[in-house]
A protein has these predicted regions:
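S-adenosyl-L-methionine
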Residues: 1-35
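A conserved structural/catalytic subdomain of Rossmann-like adenosyl-cofactor enzymes
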Residues: 21, 26-239
Length: 239
């Protein structure tokens, strides 16, 4: 199954492209040079992991949180004017530990964090936490952050994933950073310099919480069980 996915990724890559298999976090940020930088970084880094002390030594903001180390790496490898689109757990926006506060400060002061897409639960299967997508451009400081609270009007899950239609309004409004019942802007001057808190606080009525129905949860569990059974059957056939 993993080999099949790898083949599909390789077949979809441009002939001029290349793949590098390495542990990104073992690279010291101080060693990254201009020739190592990129114009665009799109990523969904793993979060919830705990990195070893020797790995943390490679970063100016030391933390065991895997996703926070990756975010520092992404900012570093972008060229001036480079664009980033990163999926990260939503608690990054409000955590009060020193690493989270320092990382938000770094992001706001070294990049233009222009968009925060607040995703509903179930958007990314297996994440276990709510997520946001942060869109930024490296170089100029952040002057204004535009938030959009995604609400597809239904519960998301493995059998009912997010689709292009769900994102249509976001794509339309984001072009001009327009305000709406689901979107608003926050002036960087109003962000608390002590915490750099970026919590999603919709001034038009607060955060909508979509509760999944019991049947939806049962259906997803059944689908996951069926998938697990298929994987186990495949493994048995290899033994």
């Amino acid at each position: 199954m993993e080999a099949s996915i790898t083949r599909r990724v390789r077949s979809s890559a441009p002939s001029s492209g290349s793949f590098i298999h390495t542990n990104t976090l073992t690279e010291n940020l101080a060693d990254i040079q201009e020739k190592d930088r990129f114009d665009v970084v799109l990523a969904n880094p793993p979060f919830g992991g705990q990195e070893r002390k020797e790995v943390q030594q490679n970063f100016p903001i030391r933390t065991g949180e895997t996703a926070f180390l990756f975010l520092q790496h992404f900012i570093k490898i972008l060229r001036a004017g480079g664009r980033g689109g990163i999926v990260i757990k939503n608690t990054f926006l409000s955590n009060t530990d020193n690493a989270s506060v320092s990382l938000r400060k770094m992001l706001l002061e070294s990049c233009n964090l222009h968009t925060v897409l607040d995703c509903p639960g179930g958007t990314f299967q297996g994440a276990g936490v709510k997520t946001v997508v942060i869109l930024f451009e490296k170089g100029a400081k952040t002057r204004k952050v535009w938030f959009y609270q995604l609400d597809p009007g239904r519960n998301l899950g493995k059998t009912n994933p997010l689709n292009d239609e769900d994102l249509a309004e976001f794509v339309k409004l984001q072009k001009t950073f327009a305000n709406s019942p689901k979107s608003w802007s926050v002036d960087a001057k109003t962000i608390d310099p002590a915490t750099f808190d970026l919590s999603v606080k919709n001034p038009n009525g607060g955060e909508a919480i979509a509760h999944r129905s019991p049947q939806d949860i049962i259906d997803e569990i059944a689908a996951l069980d069926a998938h697990s059974a298929e994987v186990l059957q495949t493994i048995k056939g290899l033994v």
